[in-house]
Structure formats: C-alpha cells, structure tokens
Curated annotation (Swiss-Prot):
Enzyme class: oxidoreductase
Protein name (database record): Bifunctional fatty acid conjugase/Delta(12)-oleate desaturase
Keyword Nucleus set for record: no
Description of its domains: The histidine box domains may contain the active site and/or be involved in metal ion binding.
Species of provenance: Trichosanthes kirilowii (Chinese snake gourd)
Pathway(s) this gene product operates in, as recorded in its UniProt entry: Lipid metabolism; polyunsaturated fatty acid biosynthesis
Function: Converts a single cis double bond at position 12 of linoleate incorporated into phosphatidylcholine into conjugated 11-trans and 13-cis double bonds. 16:2(9Z,12Z), 18:3(9Z,12Z,15Z) and 18:2(9Z,12Z) are substrates for the conjugase to form trans-Delta(11) and cis-Delta(13) double bonds. No activity on the cis-Delta(9) double bonds of oleic and palmitoleic acids.
Membrane topology (UniProt): Multi-pass membrane protein
Gene that this sequence comes from: FAC
Length: 387
C-alpha cells in the first residue's frame, strides 16, 4: 500500500517531497475557505439519497456474502485450511465493517442526504450495530472538526507537551515495547476512547461517551446520549441471545473479531491523518480553524481506499468540507490542490511502515525554544521523541 515515501507538497502544478525531518509550511494560509470552495465544482457538494444508499447496500451485500461463506463452508474445510480461512474472513469482514463505519460517520456530518432524520436513522443503526454510541460520537467528533490541531481543544489523539509525559514512558520507547503499545492501541484504543476518553482531550473530571454528564456534552444533548446508550444496550442483549443460542465462540468468530479489526482500522486511519513528524500543533495564541484543519494528511491504503470509501486519501477535503459526500471527494481533492499549493499534504509511505515511524517519532510536542525562534513560533508545537 502506498506509492512512495515522504510527505508530498505542491508548488504550482508540480509537487515535491519533503526530506525526513523537514517541516511543512505552517504560516497562516494566504487564502480563505471561500476561495477554496470556489475552486470545487458545485455538484461536488450535492448529496444524493439514492447514491448514498447504494453504497450501504453494496457493503451489506459484501458483508452478507462473507458471512454466508464463513458460516456455511468453513466447517467443511480440511484442518490446515481452517486456520487460513478464518483470518481471511476476519480481515475482509472487518474491512467492510470499516466502510460501513465511514458511512455512519458521514451521516453524523450530514453528508449522506438532504434529510437530517434519514441521516440520523441510518447513522444510528449502523454505528449502534458496531457498539458505537452514534449521537455521542457525532457530538464529540463535531468538536474535533471544530478544533483540529488545537493543543487545548482538539478532542482525540491530542499529543502531550514533554512536561506532561508520564515518567515511565521513557522505558517504553524500545522496539518490543513499541510493538506492544501499537497492538494495544489498535485493538483497545477505540473502545477505551469511547468509554474512558483515553487519548482524548484533557478534562478536569471523568469523561465518557456513555455519560450524559460528561463535559463533552451540553445539557440539551442529554437525551441524545441516552438514546445512544439504549441502542448499545439493545445490541448487547442481542449478542447475549446469540451467544446463548449459538455459543460464545460463534459470536466471537463471526462478530467480535471483525469488529475488533474494524476498530483497529478506525484508530489507524484517524490517528495517521493528523500525525506526522513534519506536522505542528498550535496553542490558543496561534490556532485558527483553517490553519488547524490544514494539519491533515491524505494517505494511500491501496485497494482499501475504495473499501473505506476514500476517507483515507481525501481526508484533507473532508476536513475542509465535512458535509461533502465521499463519492465526490476525489474530484474535489483534485480541484483544491491548485489553491492549497504547499498546504496540501499527501504521504504515500506504505501504511504500516508509516504507522511504525509515527509511533516512533511522534512521542510528544514542544515549541522551538532556541534563541533564533520568533515570538510567533512559541505557540507552534512540533513532534519530538527524545525523552
């Protein structure tokens, strides 16, 4: 996956790759969001209910096919093939589930249709089926889009300044510990974020997507959190009944492992879109909405780009115009490159190599403290890894 290493920036009609350690341009952009929007064909902002549903149906056909093959054929396979078939099913089904996760996430952005009720019903059913509290996540994710790359207000994968790093972390930077951290992050990171705000924005009190009194939510969002929780309870009850009827092992093989694969992809995708050794974070003295949202990176997941409905390689446009449907984002990305110039970022590094690099290099953030640093750069924080 990926067509080359190094972060790609544009200059006019050509593109160049930054050398490792070279920083992106972080000066305030010389264009506005309205100028970017003018470069995009108007039809890219149009949402088609029928076309959006076609992607849901398409994904359900694939998911049903994979389920049918596994449920009706795997027990007939010779014993050695049995151990190859199940991991293949888990990867394929988890990938399709990730595509459905992306569609539900688009519903939360009002990118599915022109009808909010339709968007919320579809998004609620899809996300709830994966044990995700739809409305609760919709609210916190909206905050992420409103505060991207803000050191104080971004909602998820917020890097810590060096002074706030745990004392023991310096013992976790060796390769074996890094492998363990990556594994735990991918498998448990998503549910731990939802349940306990792990890797989320710092709040003074307990924070959870399942607690309507969490500081994430306002008083008028209380009912939405309870509706989300009721949906999760219903799915847990359904899983309990399935386990009673078919056995826990069946539920784990057919549902739990693919959902875990989906969770891993969600963490991998969302973390790598805003984390790179060349990327800054801003404190309140330097941050603004456009500047923060341009700290976003398109990446290449190969054929999985299509399976994931291009959320991976059109993430820059998605952050600038989150209500744009995914099926128009590729055309919009091509259109905005000329306006964004060196503010458009793409990294074709093979994705697992990129993940290893980012986990190794992006440990904490600090501003430049040398004497040559300007006063404005004091509010610009860069990733570092020397503890």
């Amino acid at each position: 996956m990926g067509g080359g290493e190094g972060i790609e920036v544009r200059s006019g009609s050509s593109s160049t790759k930054l050398a490792f350690g070279e920083r992106i341009t972080h000066a305030k952009p010389p264009f506005s969001i309205s100028q970017i929007k003018k470069a995009i064909p108007p039809h890219c902002f149009q949402r088609s209910l029928y076309r959006s549903f076609s992607y849901v149906i398409f994904d359900f056909i694939f998911a049903s096919t994979f389920y049918h093959i596994a449920a009706t054929n795997f027990h007939r396979l010779p014993h050695p093939l049995h151990y190859l078939a199940w991991p293949l099913y888990w990867f394929c089904q988890g990938s399709v589930f990730t595509g459905l996760w992306v569609i539900a996430h688009e519903c939360g952005h009002r990118a599915f249709s022109d009808y909010q009720l339709v968007d919320d019903v579809v998004g609620f059913l899809l996300h709830t089926s994966f044990l995700i509290p739809y409305f609760s996540f919709k609210i916190s994710h909206r905050r992420h889009h409103s505060n991207t790359a803000s050191l104080e207000r971004d909602e998820v994968f917020v890097p810590k300044p060096k002074a706030k790093m745990p004392w023991y972390f310096k013992h976790l930077t060796n390769p074996p510990a890094r492998v363990l951290i990556i594994f735990i992050t991918l498998t448990l990171g998503w549910p731990m974020y939802l349940a306990f705000n792990i890797s989320g924005r710092f709040y003074e009190r307990f924070t959870s997507h399942f607690d309507p009194n969490s500081p994430i939510f306002s008083e008028n969002e209380w009912l939405q959190v309870h509706i989300s929780n009721a949906g999760i309870v219903a799915v847990w009850y359904l899983l309990y009944k399935l386990a009673a009827a078919k056995g826990i092992a069946w539920v784990i093989r057919m549902y739990v492992v693919p959902v875990t694969i989906m969770n891993a992809f969600v963490v991998l995708i969302t973390s790598l879109q805003h984390t790179h050794p060349s990327f800054p974070y801003y404190d309140s003295t330097e941050w603004n909405w456009l500047r923060g949202n341009l700290v976003t990176l398109d990446r290449d997941y190969g054929i999985l780009n299509k399976v994931f409905h291009n959320i991976t390689d059109t993430h820059v446009v998605h952050h600038l115009f989150p209500s744009m449907p995914h099926y128009n984002a590729m055309e919009a990305t091509r259109a905005v490159k000329q306006v964004l110039g060196e503010y458009y970022h793409f990294d074709g590094t093979p994705i697992f190599k990129a993940a290893w690099r980012e986990f190794r290099e992006c440990i904490y953030v600090e501003p430049d403290n040398d004497e040559g640093a300007s006063s404005s750069s004091k509010g610009v924080f860069w990733f570092r890894n020397k503890l």
